[in-house]
Amino acid sequence: MDKREQYIDKQIIEQIMELRKQLHRIPEHSMQEVKTKQLLMDFLKSHTALEIVDCGAWFYAVKRAYDRVTTENDKTFHVSEVAVEIPEQMTEYKPPIAFRADMDAVCGKDGKPGHFCGHDGHSSVLCGLGLYLDSRKEPLAQDVYLIFQPAEEIGKGAELCRSLIKEKHIGEIYGFHNIPGKPLGTVLVKDGTFACASTGLEIHMTGTPSHAAYPEAGRNPG
């Protein structure tokens, strides 16, 4: 048995591997992820019953938990028109959580986009999570949002998704970055900030140029 099947269904593995190959063939620059977004949305629509919301430059999918119904023993949740009994530990309200993946490609030295940073893999894995959640028979304790973020490479995509976090009162967001070469099933974590990036730095300096033969005519910038 493929060791990966210890963690996830073989059919889901095959589906997300094929999806990654398709995404790898259509890399797009930040804020231009038109084909990428459409492919991901079409995939989830074709393979799941998740609620999908198109937000223009990005989108999200939702796996809903059972809507709560107040009952005498406070253990009954309601789905459509069918009431079901669920375990006692799942009766408490929990705020929604989210999982996030980036969609954009890196701009190569030739100016063309390419998935050199693995965002095709990130988006495929998030779709795989969607497949898994959709296949679950057990009720969820909270709504789960899958956020497909654009423009991670230029630092603009997260800002676009902030409104959803506030509007839906999402309490926690999870994301990851693939790191090839590590053993299968390994998750690397670190206390505190990890892999933070600069948002950019501009320095303005004023001076007077001159020829090296006449340094006294120039003024060092300051």
Where are the regions a protein language model picked out?
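Acidic/His- and Gly-rich active-site-bordering loop/insert found
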Residues: 2-116, 120-131, 135-140
